[in-house]
Swiss-Prot record, chain A:
HAMAP family: MOC2B (MF_03052). The lineage of its organism: Eukaryota, Metazoa, Ecdysozoa, Arthropoda, Hexapoda. It comes from Drosophila yakuba (Fruit fly). Its EC number is 2.8.1.12. Pathway: Cofactor biosynthesis; molybdopterin biosynthesis. CDD domains: MoaE. Keywords: Cytoplasm, Molybdenum cofactor biosynthesis, Transferase. It catalyses: 2 [molybdopterin-synthase sulfur-carrier protein]-C-terminal-Gly-aminoethanethioate + cyclic pyranopterin phosphate + H2O = molybdopterin + 2 [molybdopterin-synthase sulfur-carrier protein]-C-terminal Gly-Gly + 2 H(+). One of its GO terms (molecular function) is molybdopterin synthase activity. This is Molybdopterin synthase catalytic subunit. It is found in: Cytoplasm. InterPro entries: MoaE_sf, MOCS2B_euk, Mopterin_biosynth_MoaE.
Swiss-Prot record, chain B:
The gene is Mocs2A. C-terminal thiocarboxylation occurs in 2 steps, it is first acyl-adenylated (-COAMP) via the hesA/moeB/thiF part of MOCS3, then thiocarboxylated (-COSH) via the rhodanese domain of MOCS3. Acts as a sulfur carrier required for molybdopterin biosynthesis. Component of the molybdopterin synthase complex that catalyzes the conversion of precursor Z into molybdopterin by mediating the incorporation of 2 sulfur atoms into precursor Z to generate a dithiolene group. In the complex, serves as sulfur donor by being thiocarboxylated (-COSH) at its C-terminus by MOCS3. After interaction with Mocs2B, the sulfur is then transferred to precursor Z to form molybdopterin. It is found in: Cytoplasm. One of its GO terms (molecular function) is nucleotide binding. This is Molybdopterin synthase sulfur carrier subunit.
Length: 367, 90
């Protein structure tokens, strides 16, 4: 039998037990919801309950029929809810069920209180001690409007949803309030930052042992490894990384020529130290270096600007070594193969040849 | 509102926070015989000053919740509408 009631007086638990009693039942389960005396540090004096009586009873009866369809073995069901002012620590709701075996009784009561909090139109207001304003409570389970009721009528704009829910894994829909969203974004940014930081450390400090690893995605220009040795605090081995994509590469690199000019305070081609010196210097040695470094040379150029060019090249090579040859695009090199030496080939006539042979013969005869 | 189509007189009940905002437990209102739930909600919210809780309200028509706001509601004379703020029973 179903016992559904809204009551204005204290609920008598003994009476509930009488309602549940049945000779064929081995289990009766009783849930008693009582009023707490505190909320967020505020002392609760009492609670005021109100209900949409007729609808509340209707919903409570619906819960009973739901329970019976889910657990057909249930014998008696009791749902009592108290209304009006309820002092703290008194029962505001009692849900009870009896059944031949315990599992139905226990599960159904648990299900019923969840349903009651979700569907039954009853409200409570907490009245606090002191100057705090009383507050209408809200069950987290409470039935709520499904859509956000903004001025825009979403319902009027049907949205076609693809049958297959193949949402890219990278996309996530999040429905939260602004504060929560801000918090999550902050967490995300912080985590990304940490990730990048740790990656940077890995970039710089990776083991030589795993040198077969591909570092082409690393932004680091150097790799280092700590090699522990006895009697030593630290041994850091550094090697350079061939990285064509790194921000320091190529275009982004400082203009060494300009920097060096600044350092030397020289204006290219304008300072012209002693011409004797230029002439006296054997240019061949410099030329050899220049050609080795793929520099176009001009013997008439100021010797200092030529040396400077070599220095620039050295700096550049240092910054990109050792594989510089693969990606330094330079002016066409002056390393064309030297013109072949013209060796005049002498041609002999038949008479000359026979005379020559005769000469050898005669000579052999003389000796 | 009442300009086009027939209208019916409907009872409106207020509870908890909505009762305090509307300053009355019950009222009567003239409504068209057919209206979408979202329009109905807008109408009631503006008529009874329920704006502070409009996003948390749910309506009950003749003691049944209106779950879907795009639903078309048909009214008869003397129907009962309830303004239901979030529940807190138990």
């Amino acid at each position: 039998m179903d016992h559904v009631k809204l009551v204005n007086d204290p609920i008598d638990i003994a009476h509930i037990h009488q309602l549940l009693a049945d000779e064929g039942c081995g289990a009766s389960s009783v849930f008693v919801g009582t009023t707490r005396d505190n909320f967020q540090g505020k002392k609760v004096v009492s609670l005021a309950y109100e209900a949409y009586d007729s609808m509340a009873l209707k919903e409570m009866n619906k819960i009973c029929s739901d329970l019976r369809s889910k657990w057909p073995d249930l014998k008696h069901i009791v749902i009592y809810h108290r209304l009006g002012t309820v002092p703290v620590c008194e029962a505001s709701v009692v849900i009870a069920a009896s059944s031949p075996h315990r599992s139905e009784a226990l599960e159904s009561v648990s299900f019923a209180i969840d349903q009651l909090k979700t569907r039954v139109p009853i409200w409570k207001k907490e009245i606090y001690e002191g100057d705090y304003d009383s507050e209408w409570k809200e069950n987290k389970e409470s039935i709520r409007p499904k859509k956000s009721q903004s001025a825009f009528n979403y319902a009027a704009c049907p949205c076609k949803v693809e049958e297959s829910h193949d949402v890219p894994r990278t996309l996530v829909q999040i429905r939260v309030n602004d504060a929560e969203l801000t918090k999550r974004l902050e967490c995300f940014v912080n985590r990304k930052r940490d990730e990048i930081n740790s990656q940077n450390v890995i970039d710089f400090k990776s083991s030589f042992v795993n040198s077969d690893k591909d570092f082409s995605d690393s932004c680091a220009r150097t790799q280092s490894t700590i090699i522990k040795q006895e009697q030593s605090n630290s041994h850091l081995k550094v090697r350079r990384v061939n990285n064509r994509c790194g921000p320091q590469q190529m275009e982004m690199r400082p203009n060494y020529e300009l920097e060096l000019n600044k350092l030397m305070g020289s204006r290219d081609g304008q300072t012209d130290p002693s011409k004797e010196m230029r002439k006296s210097l054997p240019n061949s040695r410099l030329q050899a270096i220049e050609s080795y470094m793929c520099l176009t040379t001009d013997n008439e150029e100021n010797i200092f600007s030529r040396i400077k060019k070599v220095e620039n090249r050295l700096l550049q090579l240092e910054s990109i070594s050792p594989e510089y040859r693969h990606f330094t695009k330079l002016e066409p090199s002056s390393m064309e193969p030297p013109p072949p030496k013209k060796i005049r080939k002498k041609s002999y006539s038949a008479q000359e040849l026979s005379a020559f042979i005769q000469k050898i013969k005669d000579g052999s005869e003389f000796t | 509102m009442n300009a086009d189509g027939p209208v019916v007189n409907v009872h409106v009940l207020f509870f908890a926070k909505s009762r305090e905002l509307a300053n009355t437990p019950r009222s009567k209102v003239d409504l068209p015989t057919e209206i979408t739930a979202s329009d109905l909600l807008e109408l009631l919210v503006s008529k009874f000053g329920l704006t502070p809780i409009r996003d948390n309200l749910i309506l009950a028509h003749n003691e049944s919740y209106i779950d879907n706001l795009s639903e078309r509601i048909l009214f008869k004379e003397g129907d009962e509408l309830a303004i239901i703020p979030p529940l807190s029973g138990g």
